[in-house]
Regions:
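Catalytic-histidine neighborhood of serine endopeptidases
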Residues: 9-52, 57-60
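Gly/Ser-enriched beta-turn/beta-hairpin loop segments
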Residues: 46-50, 58-67, 108-122, 173-181
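Flexible, gly/ser-rich surface segments that form the specificity/activation loops bordering the active-site cleft
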Residues: 73-117, 151-159
Length: 182
């Protein structure tokens, strides 16, 4: 179980970004929206290096009342996020769905290394869970970081997130069904 964020509405389907880890090996994938309606989703593509997965949900499978409440997230510029910036952790930062926590960015200078790249990490003072997932949102409502279980900090009590600005190209390619070359 993890959270996801709606990153695009193509008119035919909604694209939802989540962690591959939590759907890997699943026989079926179901998405639950804030109004507790649940629909089936399909894996569109994933990046094995970062662990990001893109799901698609057919708009025709979603009730009109639910569609009317859905908003597509704006992926912001996390490079403008500085130490002391106020952020909201949305999704399941405590490991339970529909959680919201607030706090500040404590560092923007840390990074993680994957097979082919280094990614900036946003460290916060938000007490969360090592099983947490979701996004960090700035006060303008833009996603600036992606909280992922595989990249939790050494201090398991505080949330860290990968800087979304460095992931935009990967997210776009996955959303278009393209594979990520290594």
């Amino acid at each position: 179980q993890a959270s996801g964020v709606i990153i695009a509405d193509t008119g035919q389907e909604l694209l939802i970004m989540t962690e591959r880890k939590v759907i890997s090996g699943a026989k079926s994938i179901h998405v639950t929206f804030l109004d507790n309606s649940t629909v089936e989703a399909e894996l569109k593509n994933y990046d094995g290096n970062t662990g990001i997965a893109i799901l698609n949900v057919k708009r025709s499978d979603i009730e009109e009342s639910t569609l009317g409440r859905i908003k597509v997230a704006v992926l912001g510029n996390s490079l403008q996020t500085t130490q002391g910036s106020v952020v909201l952790a949305l999704g399941s930062p405590l490991g339970t769905n529909f959680s919201i926590l607030t706090g500040n960015i404590t560092s923007t200078s840390n990074s993680i290394s994957t097979f082919d790249a280094n990614y900036n990490v946003l460290t916060t003072d938000i007490v969360g869970s090592s099983q947490g997932s979701g996004v960090l949102v700035n006060l303008s409502g833009e996603v600036v970081g992606i909280v992922m279980q595989d990249y939790s900090s050494g201090d398991e009590n505080t949330l860290t997130a990968i800087s979304v600005s460095q992931l935009k190209d990967i997210i776009e390619k996955l959303s278009n069904g393209q594979d990520i070359p290594y």
